[in-house]
């Protein structure tokens, strides 16, 4: 009978967890508090509401020591008027705000990407996404800029809701599995978009699994297409091969070699 490294994988996923009492979280929250206060001061009457979303809100963000591209997503919902402003207007407002408070200050940098304005502060990216909100068929609907210069609908809490439901349904193994997979993804140069990877992993069926079985299952479900870059296909194939080797050494009751193969894909 094969031995298990379930506890080892769970501990490893905890290592990839950005803990609430960590110094990194304290710095992030301090910067967020200042950022929100500055938004209130500068654009207060123009803003309807603002809220954190993304991996930070879903509790799947990785520490910077693992993922150099970890970022904090902030949705800024503007008040709309009878005179409809374009998405670019709201983005420009955020850019002017960011330049005023953060450009070349505190060692920070401001970048106008799409559809956000990014403030790089203390090695953390804070992505400010402009949005508007309208009542449609009795329900509030959020819109963010699209690449055509107009608006597109969005539901920033959709993945969080699905993830929370899945994590509860499958005995709290989904978030650890996501952290393991995201750690592999970022250390291999992001063959998958982080958001799309989380969405995919959230939708899998982990019935009866523990972290080990669920992680091995999730690796097996990764796929690529003929049109994907060869580098992506190679990285996914390499991960699958490494996990096959892990399974083989577990069958041989050799946890040392199993872990060696595991860490060909996952950071220690």
Residue positions per predicted region:
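Extracytoplasmic/secreted envelope proteins and their assembly/folding machinery
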Residues: 29-32, 36, 91, 95, ...
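Conserved catalytic core of two-metal-ion nucleotidyltransferases
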Residues: 39, 91-139
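N-terminal regions immediately upstream of nucleotidyltransferase
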Residues: 1-69, 81-88
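Conserved nucleotidyltransferase catalytic core and NTase-mimicking acidic/glycine-rich helix/loop elements
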Residues: 173-268
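Glycine-rich, often proline-containing surface loops adjacent to acidic residues and nearby aromatics
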Residues: 69-78, 156-161
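Extended, alpha-helix-rich binding/interface surfaces that flank or overlap catalytic cores
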Residues: 44, 62, 116, 120-180, ...
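A generic structural motif
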Residues: 78-84, 206-208
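An acidic- and aromatic-residue-enriched active-site/binding cleft used to recognize and process polar
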Residues: 53-58, 77-80, 122, 131-133
């Amino acid at each position: 009978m094969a031995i298990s490294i379930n506890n080892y994988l769970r501990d490893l996923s905890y290592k990839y967890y950005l803990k609430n009492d960590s110094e990194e979280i304290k710095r992030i929250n301090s910067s967020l508090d200042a950022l929100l206060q500055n938004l209130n001061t500068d654009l207060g009457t123009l803003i309807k509401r603002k809220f954190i979303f993304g991996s930070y809100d879903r509790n799947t963000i990785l520490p910077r020591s693992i993922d150099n591209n970890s970022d904090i997503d902030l949705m800024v919902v503007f008040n709309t008027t009878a005179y409809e402003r374009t998405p670019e207007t709201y983005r420009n407002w955020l850019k002017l705000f960011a330049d005023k408070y953060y450009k070349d200050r505190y060692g920070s940098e401001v970048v106008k990407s799409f559809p956000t304005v990014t403030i790089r502060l203390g090695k953390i990216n804070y992505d400010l996404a402009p949005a508007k909100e309208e009542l449609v068929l009795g329900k509030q609907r959020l819109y963010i800029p699209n690449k055509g210069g107009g608006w597109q609908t969005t539901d920033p809490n959709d993945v969080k809701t699905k993830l929370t439901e899945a994590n509860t349904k499958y005995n709290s193994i989904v978030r650890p599995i996501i952290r393991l997979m995201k750690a592999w993804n970022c250390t291999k140069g992001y063959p998958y978009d982080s958001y799309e990877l989380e969405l995919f992993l959230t939708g899998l069926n982990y019935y009866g699994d523990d972290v080990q079985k669920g992680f091995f299952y999730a690796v097996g479900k990764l796929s690529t297409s003929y049109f994907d870059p060869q580098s992506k296909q190679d990285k996914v194939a390499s991960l699958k091969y490494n996990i096959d080797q892990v399974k083989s050494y577990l069958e041989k009751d050799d946890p040392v070699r199993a872990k060696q193969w595991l860490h060909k894909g996952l950071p220690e």
